[in-house]
């Protein structure tokens, strides 16, 4: 079985648990996107996966490629773009306060595919 994912992978900036964005003076950095997350899970089961997307042609985009490849995800169909990689901010919930996501993806590489 082979599975391809088509979607945007973004830079995720998240707060520490219990901190609101307004209270934060730093963010934790990771990468995320629904399709990439599914492919990572499938690759753990030995399923061949490939990502179809576009990322910025800079160190962030190249780091995303390295990240995907570290999970044995085929990146043959990932294009490098002069547009930026999308970003999302994750305010990690705590107690009864749920998590909150703010997207910043206007004019991103994926939106310009």
Give the label of every model feature segment:
Residues 53-57, 79-82, 93, 107:
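Short glycine-rich, polar/acidic loop-and-turn segments at beta strand-coil junctions
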Residues 6, 81, 102-105:
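Short beta-strand segments
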């Amino acid at each position: 079985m082979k599975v391809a994912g088509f979607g945007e992978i973004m830079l995720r900036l998240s707060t520490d648990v219990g901190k609101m964005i307004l209270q934060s003076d730093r963010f934790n950095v990771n990468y995320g996107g629904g399709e990439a997350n599914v492919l990572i899970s499938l690759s753990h089961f030995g399923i061949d996966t490939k990502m179809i997307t576009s990322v910025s042609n800079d160190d962030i985009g190249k780091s995303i490629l390295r990240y995907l490849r570290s999970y044995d995800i085929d990146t043959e169909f990932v294009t490098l773009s002069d547009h930026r990689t999308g970003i999302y901010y994750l305010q990690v919930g705590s107690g009864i306060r749920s998590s909150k996501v703010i997207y910043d993806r206007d004019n991103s590489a994926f939106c310009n595919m």
